[in-house]
């Protein structure tokens, strides 16, 4: 995509999720609209977390959850880990990660949306977690040093990026050697063309921009990862699935 094409898309994504954050802040549900990531409650949002996990969180963090999985459940988080959540939204996965890695670990959340960052910081304060840091920026240009992170997580966000190869390369850059990826995302079956994906949902709705399974595997391998796996977990549209994506930095 050219800059002429990508900037309007990025702004559409930013505006959609700013509206979602403001809805939660004003006491409404965290819906981002028909055809969005959270439109199908069976496949998106807070229902994908256990009751025990939801009990650890402020209501605003769970209501604001717009993801397609629970990356903290698949990322093999360990005491003392440094974790980075790409597109951290209202902070649900950052807060859970901070609790998992304990006081010797750190959980970073990166988001480009001021409204989501404000909501996430408020939620983290209410949850009583001190080992969190929320950063403003784009996931294509992560504002952290090389080899500084043990685990990268993300929840239904990479599909929204306008430059996915750059995201995967940045993930490899910030991870330490042997660092791990534990991502949940919408992934297309390989049989679907990009045009067919767009027929099934909008870009800001996490459908049209989704990578295929082969594209994900090949992209991660090209960025410097090994032990790459993409496992479909549930269908969110015809030929489109919530998926667990795992990899290790070479």
Residue ranges of predicted features:
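Conserved alpha-helix/loop element of class I SAM-dependent methyltransferases that forms part
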Residues: 39-82, 93-96, 100
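A short glycine-rich, Lys/Arg-flanked "PGG" loop and its adjoining helix->strand segment in the class I
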Residues: 102, 165-180
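Short alpha-helix
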Residues: 208-223
């Amino acid at each position: 995509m050219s800059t002429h094409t990508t900037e309007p898309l990025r702004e559409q994504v930013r505006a959609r999720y700013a509206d979602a954050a403001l809805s939660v802040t004003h006491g409404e549900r965290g819906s981002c609209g028909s055809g969005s990531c959270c439109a199908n409650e069976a496949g998106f949002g807070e229902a994908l977390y256990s009751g025990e996990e939801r009990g650890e969180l402020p209501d605003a963090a769970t209501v604001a959850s717009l993801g397609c999985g629970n990356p903290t459940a698949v990322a093999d988080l360990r005491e003392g880990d440094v974790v980075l959540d790409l597109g951290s939204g209202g902070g649900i996965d950052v807060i859970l990660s901070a609790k998992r890695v304990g006081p010797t670990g750190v959980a970073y959340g990166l988001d480009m949306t001021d409204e989501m960052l404000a909501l996430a910081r408020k939620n983290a304060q209410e949850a009583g977690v001190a080992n969190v840091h929320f950063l403003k920026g784009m996931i294509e240009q992560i504002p952290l040093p090389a080899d500084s992170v043990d685990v990268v997580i993300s929840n239904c966000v990479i599909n929204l990026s306008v430059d996915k190869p750059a995201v995967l390369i940045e993930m490899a850059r910030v991870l330490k050697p042997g660092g791990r990826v534990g991502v949940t995302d919408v992934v297309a079956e390989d049989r679907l063309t990009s045009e067919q994906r767009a027929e099934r949902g909008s870009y800001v709705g996490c459908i049209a921009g989704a990578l295929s399974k082969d594209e994900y595997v090949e992209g991660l391998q090209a960025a410097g990862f090994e032990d790459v796996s993409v496992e479909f977990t549930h269908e969110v549209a015809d030929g489109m699935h919530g998926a667990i994506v795992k990899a290790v930095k070479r």
